[in-house]
Regions:
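Terminal interaction module
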Residues: 96-160
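Short histidine/acidic/glycine/proline-rich micro-motifs that form metal-
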Residues: 22, 69-71, 104
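Short, intrinsically disordered low-complexity segments
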Residues: 48-66, 70-71
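Long, hydrophobic N-terminal alpha-helical segment
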Residues: 3, 10-56
């Protein structure tokens, strides 16, 4: 069952899916509708999950589940991945490529392959102070505190 994101507890589990491109406003409206339907019906072993979503920067899809009410199970996680794969096909984007890095380049959000990001670090086109999106955070609390951080404070630090 859908609940507003801000109503979920801080320890709720999250999954972050960065897009390889910015979504248009029309796409965002459609994605929000799809996410609302998905989270309203998302369940684990027949029990509705208390779930929500966020869209950030017209580029990131964040799914969240209150695991205090009902744990997300393998099958429910599989259904969320299938949902994300459907969005990939529908909008011709990559959302599941974990070998990509998303970071701020001034006011612009850049999305590069890990190889390109390493090269940019070597060439000092990005620095330890570059704001990166740490999409490995696991909870709303971690998301709020450690999602947008300087590269030096994330797994990206190994490149500097």
């Amino acid at each position: 069952m859908y609940v507003p994101f801000e109503d979920l507890p801080e320890d709720s589990k999250i999954w972050i899916y960065p897009s390889n491109r910015k979504f248009s406003d029309a796409e965002i409206t459609e994605i929000e509708n799809d996410l609302k339907v998905f989270t309203e019906n998302w369940s684990a072993h027949g029990t509705g999950l208390q779930a929500s979503y966020l869209l950030r920067y017209n580029r990131f899809i964040i799914l969240a589940v209150n695991q205090e009410v009902q744990q997300a199970t393998g099958c429910s996680i599989d259904s969320s991945v299938a949902f994300i794969q459907n969005l990939e096909q529908k909008f011709q984007v990559d959302l599941l490529d974990k070998m990509d890095v998303t970071f701020k380049n001034g006011e612009h959000i850049a999305h590069k392959s890990l190889i390109d990001f390493k090269r940019m670090a070597k060439e000092k086109a990005v620095t330890a102070n570059t704001i990166v999106f740490n999409n490995l955070v696991n909870s709303i609390e971690e998301f709020n505190e450690n999602w947008e951080v300087p590269a030096s404070e994330s797994w990206h630090s190994r490149f500097f």
